Amino acid sequence: ICTNNKKIFEISKMLRSHGMVREAKNSIFEKKIINKHKYLSKKFIFLYPTLNFRNNEIGATIGLNQLKSLDKNNIKRKDNFIFFLKHLDEKKYFINFDLIGSSNYAFPLILNTKSLKVRDKFEKHLTVNNIEFRRGNAGGGNQLRQPYIKEFVKIRDFSNFKNVERIHFFGYYIGNYPNLKKEKIKKIVRILNNIKLSS
């Protein structure tokens, strides 16, 4: 796409990247949208219904090459997740996941709190300890709250969607890389278990 129209330029960047606001790379525009949608995770606001068109031939080649180790990596990820859950404080975090047939590229983490104040403190603690995370699990949380879907689905009362609402506000993903060592997982869990999750 070639354009000298700034609006089309910004929209095009979002359209190639899941419709995510952060991909516009325009801080003034981004700030305006974040302020308008304060109930969404600021890194995962989707304005347009679209796909991910960012990849290229190099990405495809890397992806095809990674398929060779897919089965091995899936086993490692599952083992990592079981190890992670085994050491996690169940008073602070939900740990009762169905693991049958599951291999997750991340550690899903759900807080056992309903306090936004506690949640915000939790996020600061992760940031200070250099633990990268996504709130709302894979990103974006409750899709019914996302701007892109509002013209298709007219739901404004989210009380019938208790589970996804809990994930939206108190669910996280932390990376589960196949080469993640047990010592590193222990360190992450130690940090998580030491966070005071009370008001």
What residue ranges belong to the model's regions?
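Active-site region of PLP-dependent enzymes
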Residues: 1-106, 141
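Short beta-strand-to-loop capping motifs
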Residues: 3, 109-113, 176
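Short, conserved charged micro-motifs
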Residues: 114-121, 181-186
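Secondary-structure transition into beta-strands, especially the periplasmic turns and strand N-termini
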Residues: 6-7, 115-118, 125
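Short amphipathic alpha-helices in soluble, non-transmembrane regions
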Residues: 12, 119-129, 188-193
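PLP-dependent enzyme catalytic core of the Aspartate aminotransferase-like
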Residues: 150-199
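Conserved PLP cofactor-binding pocket of PLP-dependent enzymes
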Residues: 18-34, 83, 122-160, 166-172
